Every structure is written in C-alpha cells, then in structure tokens.
Amino acid sequence: MAAPSLVLFRRDLRVADHPALAAAMAAGPTIGVYVLDDTADGRPLGGAARWWLHHALTRLAADLESLGVPLILRRGAQNTVVPALARDVEASGVYWSRRYTPWGVAADKGLKAWASEAGITAQSYAGSYLVEPWAVQTKQGRPFKVFTPFYKAMQAAGEPSLPLPEPEPQEPLLLTVKSDTLADWALLPTQPDWASGLRQTWQFSAGERTADFLDTAVNA
C-alpha cells in the first residue's frame, strides 16, 4: 500500500466542498485527523462549543467512514501531535484548510517548516471563505472597512468557484495506531443537561428550516 496522507480537520468538519480532503484522496490513501488543542487560541472552548464539537465530530467520523477514511482523534498541541502521528503511520503528506488568525497562521507555518525538514508534502488550501481575505482589497492594498465598496469589488471579482462534491470512496484503511474517543474528551454537559433540546435540532432540522425560508421568504 502507498504511504498515506493526513488531512487535518479544524473548523471545516465536513467531507463535501473540502479542497484539502479532495486533493489528499486524489493523491492516494488518506487518514483524517482532528487535534483537540484546548488553549490554541489562548482560551478553552466554552460549553456550547464543546457540545457542537462532539456532534460535529460524530457526524464527520461517519461521513469519512463512508469514504473509507478513518478519523484519528488526538489531544494536545497540533505541532507536537501531528509530527508524531505522521511518523507512526509513515505519512507521505499533510493537507489542511488555511487559517487566518495570527496564532493559526503561525502554527501552520511551523507545521510546514517541520514537513519540509521531514521531507514530506505539506499543502494548504482555501477552504473557509468564498475568496481569500487578501484577494479583495482597496486600491491601497488594505482591507475594506465600508460595505458598499467591498460589495462592488466582490461583484467585479466574478463568480466564486462552485462547491466541490464529496470525493469518491477509497479502499478502507485498517489502522493500528491509537485514537482517542469522544467519550475520553467528555465534551457533553451532564449536570445540568442544558443541551437536551438541541439534540433534536441538529443539521437535518437546520436544512429543513433553510429550505422553508428560501421557499417562503425568498421565493415568495
């Protein structure tokens, strides 16, 4: 079997319209990775964010499994966890969607530097916005502060790329490396269980409400 690639998931917990996942699976066997770094941006996740993360990762794991892609969960600092995992699975490359916060950019630059030294591929992709933040700027090369000029500049930039479909499934990978479980992370509230009503209004319900809004409010 060819050496696998790692795809790092952060906030982009989906399989459709995911350029990094599509590129990795086109290159060969692929392993999904999510690293829970509690203080990466200087503060721990709040209760609602932890609840969302639990259910988003549950859905992501199921969606990846349908594509033959395992999802490995690890806790710790990204730039410590990922190199160790890459060595364990003898990865040939690491793929991810770009981040734009100062700490995210710095961490990902460090990851690319490690990959270069290790002699493996490191590829980042635009997977979060319609356009990169620096692609639409004022004539002075600065971010817009007023909506109307920004809107006109976006219109002049042309149509954005169409969303990518889900990749074609690969042959399922059987791994022996260790993965945390969501139960290990204890992300869900217990006492009080304030999230009980949210469990009935997850992605499917959101899709129904969006379709209803488009039919009644937009197309009316």
What are these regions (language model features)?
Residues 142-220:
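Glycine/tryptophan-enriched, flexible segments
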Residues 1-160:
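Trp/Phe/Arg-rich N-terminal binding region typifying the photolyase-homology
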